[in-house]
UniProtKB/Swiss-Prot annotation:
Family per similarity comment: Belongs to the DsrH/TusB family.
Purpose: Part of a sulfur-relay system required for 2-thiolation of 5-methylaminomethyl-2-thiouridine (mnm(5)s(2)U) at tRNA wobble positions.
Taxonomic path: Bacteria, Pseudomonadati, Pseudomonadota, Gammaproteobacteria, Enterobacterales
Name of this chain's protein: Protein TusB
GO-annotated biological processes: tRNA wobble position uridine thiolation
Record gene name: tusB
Length: 95
């Protein structure tokens, strides 16, 4: 399953999101969801320890001016790669 976080992690039940992640899943943050990747935030350790690959939409990271402040555990991708992830996963959960 592809889990997409579109809202700020401070407006979402991130603990629930993380508890739902399985090894075969992928996690993508976009829009204000990219804030989950900020270094030293309260959710970072938990999301990094999850068994999934972590992706961020590059354009959203740059639009918020946070590129130098995000964890290296996240992979920056563009919207073309986002489409590839949606094709890879038959199911998607948007948070």
């Amino acid at each position: 399953m592809l889990h997409t976080l579109m809202k700020s992690p401070f407006e979402t039940n991130v603990s629930l999101v993380i508890s739902m992640l399985k090894k075969s899943d992928d996690f993508l943050a976009l829009q204000d969801g990219v804030l989950i990747a900020l270094k030293d935030n309260i959710f970072l350790k938990s999301i990094i320890m999850s068994p999934v690959k972590l992706y961020l939409i590059k354009e959203d990271v740059y639009a918020r001016g946070i590129r130098k402040n995000i964890s290296r555990e996240f992979i920056l991708i563009n919207y073309i790669h986002f489409v590839s992830l949606t094709l890879k996963h038959k199911k998607q959960m948007t948070w």
